[in-house]
Amino acid sequence: MPTIFQTPTPNIDITLNNSTQFYYSTPQQTSPLQKQQQQQQQQQQQQQQQQQQQTSPIQQQISQQQQISPLQQLLQKQQQQQQSPVHQIHQQLIQQIIPPKQQEKQQEKIQDELKIQSTTPVINNNINNINNNINTTNNNNKTNERQNNEESNQISTITTTGTTTGTTATIISPNKLDIEQFVKGNEKVSRRTRAHVSLQNLDFEELDAYFDTHVSTIPLEEATSLSQSNHFGFLDTNIYNDEYKQFITNLKSGGFGDINIFEEEDDEDYIPPEEEEDDDEDNINVYNDKNIDYSTNITSKNNSNEDYNSNEDHNSNDENDYNNTANNINNNNIGDESDNNNNNNNNINNNSNKGDDDDDDDDDNNDDDDDDNDISYVDLNNDGENDESSNEMAALVNDYLENEAKEINGQNGFFKLLDLNLGEQFKQVIAPLPLNQITSTIQQQQQNDFILPIENFIGISNSVLVSPIPDFDPNFKPDSKIEKKLSSITLNGTQLNNLYITTPPQQQQQSSSSINSSNTMSSSSSSSSLSKNKLKKKKKEEKRKEEKRKEEKRKEKKRKKRQSITISKFKKNKKKTNGGFSSDSESDSSSDDSDDSDFYYSDIEEGGGGNGNGSGSGVGVVDSDNEEGDSSSDDFSKKKKRKLYHTNNSNNSIENNNNNNNNNNHESTSNSIFTLTLEQIQEVKLQIAQHYQLLIQVYLLMRIQTNPENFNLNLKKKKKIQSSSSSSSSTIKEIDSAEDDEDNYNNNNNNINNDDEDDNNNNNEDDNDDIEKYYSTYRNIVNRKPPTDMVQHNGMIDSVKRMLDQLFNYHQKHVENQIYSKIIFQQMESPSKVFTRSVKKALVPHVTSQLFDSEAIKLYPYLNELIVEDPIPSFKTMEIILSIFKDHFSESYNYRNVKLNQLKFTGGEDLLLLMGVKRFGTFNWRIIQKRYFPNKTDDQLFHRYKNLLSHSSANNQLKQYLNGAKFTKEEEEKLDGAIKIHGLKWDIISRDYLHWKEPAMLKKFYEKREKQVEKKNLFERRQLKKEKRNLERQRKQEQQRLLELEMEQDEIERQKQLEFNSTNNNNNNNNNNNNNNNNNNNNNNNNNNNNNNNNNNNNNNNENSSTNSNNDSGNENNYEFGDNETEILNDNIEISTTIDINNPIIENNSSTSTTRETSPVQMNPCPISSLSITNQQFQLQQDQYQLQQYQFYQQQQQYNQQQYEQQQQQQQQQQQQQQQQQQQQQQQQQQQQQHEQQQNEQQRTNNLSTETIIKSDNLNIVDGILIKWTREEDRIILITVKEKGTVDNEIWKSLSDTKIQDKTPDQIMYRYLQLLELIKRSQFAKQ
């Protein structure tokens, strides 16, 4: 049989979500079964050709006239389609989806295919020829009739219209694959299983198309009516429900891999147990929508055996009516093939039931064989090769629904957990809640708004699982911008629904919307009706939203009024000495507010801190639904420690955040995600477990206080007294009426009754003893008096119950998300292998949660059952209930271990306190108590905070955080600005400017900074003083050195003078002696001459004597002077000595020789008469000497001055030389720097060349150092330069100080230049 070459054209479907879906079919290889069938078909074709040769020439002419060229048929189809309004919508959608280039390519392909099809024979003509030949066959030939019946079932085409587009698709009954015959032929006695059918050459896209055709889409309007909701408001997923079967068949396969996580042992060899088949179970009914026109009721069996070829006496008219109905449907949809096909089909069916009785028996057998496989499907490719594979998959799906799905239903109803609940417009996928979930009225309203359509389960495959958001990182430092976002995130708030599954990105949404589907398509009128209905729904939803907003605004106004009232009352009561809120109106309002809002969703101004010793209850639990009046009495006693006005500002800021969150409930939020370490996750798990344990104990103890029998001990004592009096009266009656038998009988009865009363009294005594024991054990927690306001007490119980319900629900969601991640998001081989034996083990895995203590939380439903069975609570029942959780609860947190009327803070609670201080500061204790400590009061938190910060406490994390947290520059600037405005008022500064810093911490930082400044100033002053002292010392040392030099010079001069004087004295003495000798000689000579002249007659002896005497006189002055002469001589001698002593010596530094300038008195030799020198002459000589001496003194002073001037000149010259040397050194340094800069520039140029060799743009070499840059740093550099518009050294310094502290300014500058070069290169490359 010739095949038709056809291009993969997109089939478009507009689903109820207004999302287009298209896919392409791929060619498929042939299996050995298909080859056998092809051989059979070829044999049939040969027989048909032989029959055609036997036909009459008249029929051949008629058939040739009826034949039309394929081009004409295609043109007729296109004209009809273009005239239809649906085709226009189809073209618009294609233009929106397919780009123009692809459209042109598709048109070219279609034109090429038309040319190919013009050469090929037409299928319709072949069909007509075959049908005409069948009319002439012998009615008695059984084999030919059997073949004709098969061909009639194979070739009959039924056309249907699309749901929303104008494109048409043909539903062809494929070649049936009789799997039972195939199994029997291989001699294997078994049911249909995947192991005995070859799945290699199957087309999975056709399988998906088969699922889509047999499973109808449920519109949104009727989803609520069709869903079978349980008492919790969720869909019931029974395994035998049709909707659930549709849900299973809608699980898509795509490009997924193995889901076999745990074991893959017996996947191929598994054979399900045999069971009796019911005809009703094989039927796959198709849902007929109001707006969708289906062709006929397509079922797994067309009719029962009674109506289909079972008896001989079927009338041809009935069969013709049946066939005419199908043909009429065909005539409505396709006009060009209606005439030929109707006649031929009628001829085939008229001849199909003619035969003998043996033929009927054979037909019955064939019907039995074909019952399980006669399932129609949509053939998108119109290829005969894929017919067999589709029947194989249909058989496998039926086998799964009959066998394997029943076994899965017995596994604790796991599929009851697979209910899904999508958000608004299916943008956000939200995990479902379990069936055993305890829900409030608010939660039920939210969950019933949106119910999952069956097809839209596909959207989950594109969602992204995200780890839960942690509360805070321990190194987290909040900013003013982040606080608003963080205040909206709560540990127990509504936004935890978004922690587990987030919305997929746009690309994934588009991919999910473009999944292959081939559902039946409706007419254009149905699409318009759907659009109108959607518009009406949108309008209704908008009206509802507006009404909700109005109601929220009204509630806000009421809250503000209440707040103003409470503030006014607070001011009034503050003036009183015995302060305290004791008004009844506030307690009434608190009870009203508790009904409107949940425990954790209530506003902060309505919440309050109840005390364990207060009037509300005897348990240390706080109900946040109550107003501030419950704990305000404690605030007045402790107002010295904590100021109350700090709480007002915090409440206002958090009100705004809550209002914003209420307005944006339905919007998709993008919460910031923080990564968690394993240690942090374990800490969170411990905190949740402790919180859960404390809540259960609080809940049970508060229930005990609702039973008045646990408190009325006095009534039981009165009953004891009455019973004792009755017993005494009965003994008296016995004594008085002992004679009468009747009286004795009555007395015996009375005694029996009295004995019963005594037993009861003994039991009451035992009960009282037990109650007293319980009160002794729980004396620090439970008061003996019942609560005064039972309404308020019941409200607190409800709030604690809500918290437990929320915790359980979050745990269930967390577990379900882990299950979905293993089932849905893992790869699957094919839809037939979705639930194999190994997968069934993975469907209900033992989930180990990292965030929850699952073993303890799973017991919560049993707690609810026990509470229902215990309407009259007591201490015994409480201990019985707590014994269930004994293995999972820690003894350190049991109430029996509590002492001194308060619970000790655990390590986990200390961590929660640290998280609260980081997030809300040290003034918002009430907010911290609401968010983190429902079982504590704000006063307890404040005292714990102070105890942890005290000097006596050990080192802890809170102390490390507050003492070790460094101030940033921004915080310092804020603090300086606040000090200028408010001074040293640390409370105001920490409240208004730096609320995450404690006042004591601010004070300590300020004092420490000022001390450091003072130390710096002192150090600078001391340095100045030291410098001054050093200068003075140096000056004094120089003066002393100069004085010492002068003294040394003076001493040297004195020594020289002494030596010179000593030499002068010796010379003078020698000269004087010589003069005297000369004088004596002269005198002797004169005397001798005179004597010779006078006495010529003297003897020679006298001469000798005279001569001897003269010679002797040279040594001895034997000359005798007179008185006057001696005096004059003595004076001369004294003068000479004085002159000699004072005779100066002038030394020149240039020469070592000494010059002596003396002016001694020269006494000319004269006779004795000349010795009589007058005093006047002597005085003149003395005056001359003095003048000479004065001149010498002046010369000496001039010499000293010259020497001093020379020293100064030398010093100046030395200073000038030093200055010159310094200048030379500076010049040398400058030259060196210039030389180094030149070298650096050369290195940079070389480095740039090396960088191009390295081909890495994020590396830079500066001063021989390789530096790595990130994109964020480059972005910061470019943005700052762009904002400031200039390039200065100040910019680089500011960047290195603030934003890029790891780099120097020079490195940043060179990186900027490098970036400019890279940008230029990229632009040049583009050009």
From Swiss-Prot:
Residues 897-953 form the HTH myb-type domain. Residues 131-153, 263-390, 504-668, 717-770, 1061-1122, 1144-1168 are annotated as: Disordered. InterPro entries: Homeodomain-like_sf, Myb_dom, SANT/Myb, YY1-Transcr_Regul. Disulfide bonds: none annotated. GO terms for biological process: regulation of DNA-templated transcription. Residues 925-949 bind DNA. One of its GO terms (cellular component) is nucleus. Residues 607-619 have a biased composition (Gly residues). Residues 959-1010, 1268-1316 form the Myb-like domain. Transmembrane segments: none annotated. Residues 543-554 have a biased composition (Basic and acidic residues). Keywords: DNA-binding, Nucleus, Repeat, Transcription, Transcription regulation. GO terms for molecular function: DNA binding; transcription coregulator activity. Residues 131-142, 322-353, 511-532, 646-668, 722-732, 1061-1118, 1144-1160 have a biased composition (Low complexity). Residues 263-283, 356-374, 585-606, 624-633, 754-770 have a biased composition (Acidic residues). Residues 533-542, 555-577 have a biased composition (Basic residues). It is found in: Nucleus. PANTHER family: GON-4-LIKE PROTEIN, YY1 ASSOCIATED PROTEIN-RELATED. This is Myb-like protein O. It comes from Dictyostelium discoideum.
